[in-house]
């Protein structure tokens, strides 16, 4: 697959500088935000640039944990669909503090795009406890035990959008468990689908309900493909079931994406 052509990015140096800085602020690299005290990547809470770039820690205060490389990937994908007029909205399923969606809205603002919506889908209660009947890999990860860090309220996410002056009518929230909200989500067409649900069930629910809405030429981004085995299982099974052969492209140690070609 050919590299993404950054058509829109090259048209306005002011917007490029704005987005360059926004990415650094969202990830907390510009002020070296330390890791959360319950950080999983190293034993202390010190800020480590190489870890933050790869999205391998939980920041104490920054508005995203996905790191610089995955934020840049969002920018590349969104600017590509803008530059090539790929129809559809933008969505992230599983938003934590909202940083990835804030970047999506910032990109639309930077390029004066007014006919696309950013959809913010999350339980706003953290990771579900799948129970004994749930997928074995989901039970093994037991991420609900980390909800003291992973659960972020809708009001906090809205406040984060507001602090960037980006909470407006082009941002819509879908609060609730994906199995309940996504089947009836009022989304017609998607240009970028970003999944960060971690679990098999969350990933499967997202693909089942939203992948058919992704335009040809649009992008599917999987945040935890190489970090969370159940997420990878769901993606691989869905792609096999529906004969999706589009190339999976690596973003960093954890994330992948593909461009829909048919």
UniProtKB/Swiss-Prot annotation:
GO molecular function: metal ion binding; methyltransferase activity
Positions of the catalytic residues: 72
Keywords recorded for this protein, A-Z: Antibiotic biosynthesis, Magnesium, Metal-binding, Methyltransferase, S-adenosyl-L-methionine, Transferase
Catalytic activity of the protein: desmethyldescarbamoylnovobiocin + S-adenosyl-L-methionine = descarbamoylnovobiocin + S-adenosyl-L-homocysteine + H(+)
Entries under InterPro entries matching the protein: SAM-dependent_MTases_sf (IPR029063), TylF_MeTrfase (IPR008884)
GO biological process terms held by the UniProt record: methylation; novobiocin biosynthetic process
Binding site for Mg(2+): 196, 223-224
Residues annotated for S-adenosyl-L-methionine binding in this entry: 64-65, 92-96, 122-126, 178, 196-197, 202
EC number of this enzyme: 2.1.1.285
Pathway recorded for this protein: Antibiotic biosynthesis; novobiocin biosynthesis
A family per Pfam: TylF
Signal peptide span: none
Gene3D superfamilies, per database record: Vaccinia Virus protein VP39
Cofactor: Mg(2+)
Cited function: S-adenosyl-L-methionine-dependent O-methyltransferase that methylates at 4-OH of the noviose moiety, the penultimate step in the novobiocin biosynthesis pathway. Novobiocin is an aminocoumarin family antibiotic that targets bacterial DNA gyrases.
Subunit structure: Homodimer.
Family, as annotated: Belongs to the methyltransferase TylF/MycF family.
Protein name: Demethyldecarbamoylnovobiocin O-methyltransferase
Organism: Streptomyces niveus (Streptomyces spheroides)
């Amino acid at each position: 697959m050919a590299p993404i052509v950054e058509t829109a990015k090259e048209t306005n140096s002011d917007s490029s500088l704005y987005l360059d800085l926004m990415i650094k602020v969202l990830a907390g690299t510009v002020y070296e935000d330390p890791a959360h005290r319950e950080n999983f990547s190293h034993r202390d809470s010190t800020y480590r640039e190489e870890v933050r770039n790869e999205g391998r820690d939980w920041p104490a205060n920054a508005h995203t944990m996905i790191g610089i490389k995955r934020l840049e990937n969002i920018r590349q994908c969104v600017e590509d669909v803008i530059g090539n007029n790929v129809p559809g909205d933008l969505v992230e399923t599983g938003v934590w503090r909202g940083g990835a969606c804030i970047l999506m809205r910032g990109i639309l603002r930077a390029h004066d795009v007014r006919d696309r919506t950013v959809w913010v889908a999350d339980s706003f209660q953290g990771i579900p406890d799948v129970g004994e009947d749930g997928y074995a890999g989901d039970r093994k990860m037991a991420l609900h035990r980390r909800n003291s860090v992973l659960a972020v309220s809708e009001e906090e996410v809205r406040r984060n959008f507001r602090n960037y002056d980006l909470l407006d009518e082009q941002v819509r929230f879908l609060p609730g468990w994906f199995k309940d909200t996504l089947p009836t989500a009022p989304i017609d067409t998607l240009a970028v689908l970003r999944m960060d649900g971690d679990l098999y069930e969350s990933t499967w629910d997202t693909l089942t309900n939203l992948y058919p809405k992704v335009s040809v030429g649009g992008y599917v981004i999987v945040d935890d493909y190489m970090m969370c085995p159940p997420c990878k299982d769901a993606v691989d099974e869905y792609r096999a079931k529906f004969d999706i052969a589009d190339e999976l492209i690596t973003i960093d140690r954890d994330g992948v994406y593909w461009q829909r070609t048919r």
